[in-house]
Amino acid sequence: MTFAGFGEHAVEFYDGLMADNSKPYWDDNLAVYRADVRAPMEALLAELAPEFGPGFAEGKVFRPHRDVRFAADKSPYKTHCGAVIEQGRGGGAYYVELSSAGLRAGGGCFHLASDQLARFRQAVDTDIHGKALEKILASLRKTGWEIKGDALKTKPRGFAEDHPRLDLLRYRSVYAVRSWEPDDTLHERACLDRVRKAWRQVRAFNEWAHDRVGPSENPRR
């Protein structure tokens, strides 16, 4: 299937799900989800995978159901559809998401396991690799990206208070994101070019994460 844009009811579907996150709503609108959201997302990922997947990772579209086993919010469905090409969480990721808010693209270290966090901080602590990451993130900010993540309020153990990259060392996850509100492009093939351009911009960040962090070697629970 060739990507031709998300369906005309894609945003409307998520507007409705935000208002009524229930199985009856889902069942009544399942055909819309499949045709206007899921199928186009799979087609989008299939067209991007040949450029961004080889030597990096496999791609997948996330399942729509939430894991509510330990969540206070028992809403059964995610209010977005996300897809990713990643080599195990934390070691770099190309991410795209559709929701009622529009389109979002991202990249970087969304989740860092303990061994990945140790390698991340070791790389940041090293002048050559730490300065390289600073330069990458500064360039992304200049081109409209937001740098986000979970960070400690204090310094991590083992590092000096005056470390030149203390702000980076505080991160327990760090990634770049940019968003587009719903517009005509979302429903056109030009949406593919929008995501491709964004992923190319974040490629240096992902390559840094691929080379310096890599996949977790911790046993899977």
Task: Identify the residue ranges that each predicted region occupies.
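Short, surface-exposed charged micro-motifs
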Residues: 95-97, 165-166
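Active-site acidic/histidine clusters and adjacent loop/turn architecture
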Residues: 10, 15-65
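Generic beta-strand structural signal
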Residues: 81, 92-94, 103-105, 172
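Compact, glycine/acidic-enriched structural inserts
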Residues: 101-159
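Hydrophobic/aromatic-rich structural module bridging two neighboring secondary-structure elements via a short loop
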Residues: 52-93
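Short, flexible loop/turn elements at secondary-structure junctions
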Residues: 37, 66-68, 85-89, 100, ...
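Long, solvent-exposed, polar/charged low-complexity segments
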Residues: 1-16, 40, 52, 143-221
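Short, intrinsically disordered, low-complexity segments enriched in Ser/Thr and Pro
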Residues: 49-67, 120-123, 127-135
